[in-house]
Amino acid sequence: MRAVHVTTPGTAEVVELEAPTPAPGEALLRVRFAGICGSDVQTFLGTQPFASYPRIPGHEFSAEIVEINGDSDRFSPGDVVTAVPYFQDGTCYACRRGLINACEHNETMGVHRDGTFQELLTMPLDRLHRADGVDPRDLALVEPFSIGYHAVRRAQVAEGERVQIGRASCRERV
């Protein structure tokens, strides 16, 4: 299978890798679409402070389930899914308080661990989300859209109100 490897800052190449095998409780996914986030650009440029090399970037994606290792009453081969791209330890102070976004040991796909710029990848079933009826192209952007949705909800913006977008770089554009 092919993957995009950022070998060193500023250098990327398409490489052939062995297809991964899902562990028990994991699914093998075929990536359908992958978005390019600002963190992917930072990883390529060498300005992402947490990236190590070589690294396969990417965390915004949609995929089709190819195979499931084990039983699942939620998913089947052929389902189109996306996934939570952040892996928390669940035991640190932040996680115990429900603040998983502040996990002391977070591993983000494409930064701390290989990401979605590859044809196939494995993912724990408990991280997957089906989105029946959603176009896979749109599903690949659910993570950046959810950030905007969260901001609007948190600010309690009401219909008809105006908002100002204070910053719109390539990282914030959808």
Feature map (PLM): residue ranges:
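Cytochrome P450 core scaffold surrounding the K-helix E-X-X-R motif
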Residues: S39-Q42
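Residue-level detector of conserved catalytic or cofactor/ligand-binding positions
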Residues: I165-V174
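NAD(P)H dinucleotide-binding glycine-rich loop of Rossmann-like/cofactor-binding domains
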Residues: D89-Q164
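Residues that mark the start of a beta-strand
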Residues: R2, E26-L28, R162
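Short, acidic/hydrophobic/Gly-rich beta-strand patch recurrent on exposed beta strands
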Residues: H5, F44-L45
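Short glycine/threonine/proline-enriched tight-turn/helix- or strand-capping micro-motif at secondary-structure
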Residues: T11-E18
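Residue-level recognition of beta-strand termini and adjacent short loop/turns
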Residues: T8-G10, A23
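Glycine-rich beta-strand-centered segment in the early N-terminal region that forms part
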Residues: P20-A34, T47-Y93, D132-V134
